[in-house]
């Protein structure tokens, strides 16, 4: 199997896993679906990222061994300290400061 074929295979495996997750979500009541919205979005981002990656053959091999590579990556991602909320707060403050600019210029 060529490296490109390996990457395509892991992508398709992860895509199938995400499709199954989505199908499961759609069986839930709307309020429960909303409780999983963040997880679904991150899982989609994982799928988008894997689409552009060129993993090494051994990386593809070990990911293919997992019954649920998307869930595995998600668990790893959730353990990281990303400063997500700090970024959100910075964006709020930045937007407020930008909206204040015209008021400051008038003074």
Label each residue range with its predicted role.
Residues 1-107:
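Acidic interaction surfaces
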């Amino acid at each position: 199997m060529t490296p490109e074929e390996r990457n395509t295979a892991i992508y398709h495996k992860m895509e199938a896993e995400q499709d199954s997750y989505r199908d499961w979500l759609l069986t839930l009541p709307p309020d429960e679906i909303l409780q999983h919205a963040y997880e679904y979005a991150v899982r989609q981002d994982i799928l988008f990222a894997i689409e552009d990656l060129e993993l090494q053959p051994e990386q593809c091999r070990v990911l293919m061994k997992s019954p649920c590579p998307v869930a595995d990556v998600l668990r790893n991602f959730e353990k990281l300290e990303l400063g997500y909320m700090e970024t959100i707060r910075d964006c709020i403050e930045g937007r407020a400061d930008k909206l204040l600019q015209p008021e400051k210029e008038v003074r």
